[in-house]
Amino acid sequence: MVEPLDDAIWVARCIARMVELDPALDPELARPVVEDMCSRTRWRDMGPEAAAQAVFDLDMRRG
């Protein structure tokens, strides 16, 4: 079984993936959103990179 990631690591990895997907994204502006995501089981059950991808996929469908 895989050990769950520490919150700070999950947040850092999610933000890093978001910035990879959108280099214009300010990581500090993304931080409060990602910290909120980290507190929610729906997002936290995903890996941080998968959660970041899901946000961008959702945004692309809406856009």
Tell where the protein language model's regions lie, with residue ranges.
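N-terminal acidic leader/helix
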Residues: 1-26
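Residues within well-formed alpha-helices
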Residues: 13, 29, 50-51
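Charge-rich, solvent-exposed alpha-helical interaction surfaces
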Residues: 14-17, 33-36, 54
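Low-complexity, intrinsically disordered/propeptide-like segments
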Residues: 24, 28, 32, 59-63
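Amphipathic alpha-helical segments that form the core helices of the histone-fold
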Residues: 27-44
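Short, charged early-sequence alpha-helical segments and their helix-coil boundaries
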Residues: 39-63
